Each structure stands twice: as structure tokens, then as C-alpha cells.
Amino acid sequence: MGSRTKFCLTLFLVSVLILCAGLALAKTDPELKQCKHQCKVQRQYDEEQKEQCAKGCEKYYKEKKGREQEEEEEEEWGSGRGRGDEFSTHEPGEKRLSQCMKQCERQDGGQQKQLCRFRCQEKYKKERREHSYSRDEEEEEEGDEEQEEEDENPYVFEDEHFTTRVKTEQGKVVVLPKFTKRSKLLRGLEKYRLAFLVANPQAFVVPNHMDADSIFFVSWGRGTITKIRENKRESMNVKQGDIIRIRAGTPFYIVNTDENEKLYIVKLLQPVNLPGHYEVFHGPGGENPESFYRAFSREVLEAALKTPRDKLEKLFEKQDEGAIVKASKEQIRAMSRRGEGPSIWPFTGKSTGTFNLFKKDPSQSNNYGQLFESEFKDYPPLQELDIMVSYVNITKGGMSGPFYNSRATKIAIVVSGEGRLEIACPHLSSSKNSGQEKSGPSYKKLSSSIRTDSVFVVPAGHPFVTVASGNQNLEILCFEVNAEGNIRYTLAGKKNIIEVMEKEAKELAFKTKGEEVDKVFGKQDEEFFFQGPKWRQHQQGRADE
């Protein structure tokens, strides 16, 4: 009943205001009086409703007066336009103020002139504030660009860039902040996050689920990952080289089954709620990790679990050791046994299981390195996320590339070793300060040292090279996003793109004879992996001796 009365009051008030607006020939005060009078004479309204109606009239009147005043000020401020005064909104503020003041002199009466001048000055101050704000924004954007240029390589991440999400005596989880936090150039990776899990021997990662689709790669160690899907348990014994897809919302838990070695898992996450932001939810747990069951009222839990309050309190208050705890040998043996039937891909219908990258023959291999690559047919869950996984092992002193990907952006993690990365980047080029005119872009060499746990990104289309040190092999895990239809274009060695071009195209592009171009680009007889620059310098030094 109350809601109907409110609706009627609102409807009546709107009708009254429309009626009053029609009294355009009447003065403003009579218009307000007429509105209030209509409120008073309504017999179906009590005193409170009549008062609300009158307040509505006053609110409408004030808003209408405000709009009229703004229009009047705009007219005074820009009244010189179209009158032959060569006055426009793009002229400097001082001139606009002067023109406005001149218009005020035409006003009748001292008070009208004074009010007009005051409005001109206020408008001038407002315009100056807006101009200053706009200029500050431009300077801030320029500052951001300069900051990115000053940053040696915004595509490389080291230990200091990671944050720790979980840390206990039995292990930790570290996460790389959103890629865009480092540089706006990484906006293409805004919806992805990268995390590392390190679990000590016989450690147990308690059950949880995430609001993110994820790809796990076991970079070291062995263990068991158990997923709960549609009231069925799938347990997978995993080892180095295994790829596992965990769907968003899927409960899972992990145990390190080794008694001596740590378990290392690299996780690429694609959040499903907020781009670049994901949460971990713990059901089984207590105070640490906090169980989401504790968020519900006791009455709800008692009814849902059909258990008295005192028992619920005991259950959800015991766990305080964190999200990674120690398991006994007996518990590990029980959890490492196969779940409800075999679950390794591709022997189980719809199961996503696992795929081991190292069981494939390398797609590229010579004395200087090996490249292992997954394909969508190897592990179909990758196709759903449009992600490919690869692993490169560069022999010490060797190098891979230069090459570039046509569509895929590479997120690379150094698993072992050290070396150097070089990227040709047009975005951070300093050519705009060189004063030299060019018909195309200029490129800046982004060079960085990389080592175990370094992360680097190579955007699509950017040529790059990785060089291993002379001390040990350089092993790199790569996630390539936007992988569907990607083509790798090699820039040196066998099958490089220059060799395929016509002689005339080479001559026109390099402004030299085609034979000379062929001598340079046809000399390297290896493919993809080559002898690195350090080896070459070392051998030349020995030859000079």
C-alpha cells in the first residue's frame, strides 16, 4: 500500500511540474507558488506527503534556475562570437576575458555590470583551472613514456618483481604482479598472471580452487596432483616435463612424493572474473589457510552440514599451519596411488590428464641446442586457451635465433643456467631525438642478462636472440599466448626469410647486388641454433695465438 502511495505521489509531482513548465509566460516565483499550491489542495495526501511534494517543487525550481544561469553565463562569456569581433573558444583566456568585460559595459545599471564582470572573472578562473589540469595530464603521460624509455628493458622480470602469496616451512608460492604494472607495452598480457610453486619433499598443498583457468608445467621434481570433477577424483602422478590444465573452479591438491627433491611447478593463469586478478579459495582448512566455510553464519552451516555448532567450531579452528603442510609417508603413499581409474591423456575419454613435453622428439636439434614444442593435437586442452608450451635447451656457448613469432607473444621462464637476451624493439626507440628523417621505424636494442628464475616477454613481431653463457646450458620454458595460426620466421641460418626472396627484391631492399646478399645470408649452414658469439671470440683468440 505504501509503495502505491509513493508511486502516486511521484506521478502527481511530475504532472504538476509539467503543468508549471507550461506557464512559460508567467514569472518564476508564481510558477513555484502554483506548484506548491497544487500540492496543498490534494485531499488524498497527508501532511507529510504534502511537504514532500512541496520540497520536490523547490528542488525542481532550483535546478531549473541553475541551468538558466549557466546558459546565461555561457552567453555572456561567448557573446562576442559571430559579431565580427574575431572571437572564438580557441583564443587565449586573457583575450576571452577582455571580450567578456567589454560586453558587460553594454549592461544597464551598475549592479548588472558588476554581476556581469564577476561572472566573466569566474569563467576565466574555471577555464584556467581546466587548462592547467589538461596540461598536467599531458605532462604525466609524457613522463610515463620517458620512464619507460629510461627502464633498460621493461620486458624482463627478476626476483625483486615477484610477491610472495604463500610461505610456510614446507614451501611457498610467488606471483608476478600484473604485466601492465611494469609497462603499458604489455597490455596484450593484461589478462594473464604467472606464478611459481615450490614444495619441499613430502609437502602437501591443501585443497583449493581458483577463479582462473591455468596451465601447470612441472619444471623439476615429481608428485601427485588430484582434481575433483563432477564428484569424481582424478589423480595424476606427474614428473618433470608434464603439462597439466586445471579449469577455473576445479578443486585440486598437490603432494610432493619425493623424499629428497623439491617440486617446482610454473603456473600460467588466466582469470575468469577480473582481467589480471585472481583469487585462491580454500574450503578444507581452518584459521590458516582460512576456510571460506567460516564466512557463513553458524546457523546456515548447522543446517547445511546437519552438524551442531560446537563440532563445527572444533573442525574449522584446528588448521593453522598454512596452505603447504608436511605429510607422512603413509599419507603420501595413499594419495600417490591412482584415483578412480587411469587418468593420463589420451587413454580416458574426456579426461584432460597430462602430457609430457619431453616424450616428443625435438622439433629442432643440433650441437648447439634442442627445442621441444607441444602442438594442439598433443594436448587439446591447450587449444581451448590458445596457448602453446615449448622448452628450449641451448648448449653452453650456443645461441637460438634471431627469429620472431607472427602472432604469439612469448612468456619465457629461465629454468636453469644463465645467458643474455637481445630484443629489437621499435616502441622504445630514441630516433625521435636523433633529428634524422626516416621512412620507417627505428629500433632499440634491449639487452639484458638472464639467469635461473628470470622471466622475459617477447611480443609478437619482435625479433630476438637468446645466448647461453660459456659455463652451462641455458634452459628456458616458454608459454606462447595467441598461438593459433602463429608462424615462426627465422632471420638467419637455413630457411631464413631473406633466402626465399627474389633476387630483385633483395637488390632493391639492400641497394646492393643479390649475389652479395646471398653470400651473407647463405653462409650459415645450421638451423635455429648456432654457435654463439662468445665461442667465436674464444676460438678466434686461440687462432691468433
Swiss-Prot record:
Expressed in seed. Keywords: Allergen, Seed storage protein, Signal, Storage protein. Residues 62-93, 129-154 are annotated as: Disordered. Residues 354-517 form the Cupin type-1 domain. It comes from the Eukaryota. Residues 82-93 have a biased composition (Basic and acidic residues). SUPFAM superfamilies: RmlC-like cupins. CDD domains: cupin_7S_vicilin-like_C, cupin_7S_vicilin-like_N. One of its GO terms (molecular function) is nutrient reservoir activity. Seed storage protein. PANTHER family: CUPINCIN (PTHR31189:SF13), OS03G0336100 PROTEIN-RELATED (PTHR31189). This is Vicilin Pis v 3.0101. The lineage of its organism: Eukaryota, Viridiplantae, Streptophyta, Embryophyta, Tracheophyta.
